[in-house]
């Protein structure tokens, strides 16, 4: 509880998802990792390997998931819970909603780059988690998420390859100052 008070999340919520694995293990997915006093994970960082199925699991390849749960909240207030079930035996135990991605797309734009970490799609996650090797080119039309995917890739690489990249920094290049303020 003391550590939670020290986190500077602003209006962002700590947890946005949960994965229930087929071995009765659950992981809460959030913007950063939080452990209890015994150093047991309470929340796993979205960049951690165990969080990958939250973004990539499909009906064809559930990646060991029984359920993927999305939380919609504002600060510490929980507004909505939605389940995606991968095990039909769990069908009566879920919360059905109109889709975390659709809800995010329905929000008004305010001139600021949106925090997409809760709604990253499988194809975007493949780019974000692509192994660290040479150059990676991402192409797409305007508004398709290239910039946010690139920024999340930088965050992922700095998390995953902290020691080899430590002290090297990240350079973000943009076409003008307005764009750089936007991101």
How would you name each of these model-derived features?
Residues 1-103:
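N-terminal accessory nucleic-acid engagement/regulatory domains that precede
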Residues 103-183:
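P-loop NTPase Walker
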């Amino acid at each position: 509880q003391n550590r939670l008070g020290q986190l500077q999340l602003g209006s962002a919520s700590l947890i946005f998802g949960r994965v229930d694995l087929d071995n009765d293990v659950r992981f809460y997915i959030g913007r950063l990792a939080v452990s209890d006093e015994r150093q047991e994970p309470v929340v796993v960082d979205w960049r951690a390997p165990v969080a990958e199925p939250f973004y990539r699991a499909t009906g064809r390849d559930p990646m060991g998931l029984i359920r993927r749960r999305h939380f919609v909240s504002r600060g510490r207030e929980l507004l909505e819970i939605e389940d995606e079930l991968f095990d039909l035996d769990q069908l009566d135990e879920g919360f059905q909603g109109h889709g975390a991605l659709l809800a995010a797309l329905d929000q008004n734009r305010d001139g600021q780059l949106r925090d997409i970490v809760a709604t990253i799609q499988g194809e975007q996650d493949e780019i974000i988690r692509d192994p660290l090797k040479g150059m990676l080119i991402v192409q797409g039309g305007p508004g398709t998420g290239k910039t946010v995917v690139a920024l999340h890739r930088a965050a992922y690489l700095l998390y995953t390859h902290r020691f080899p990249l430590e002290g090297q920094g990240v350079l973000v290049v943009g076409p003008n100052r307005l764009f750089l303020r936007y991101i």
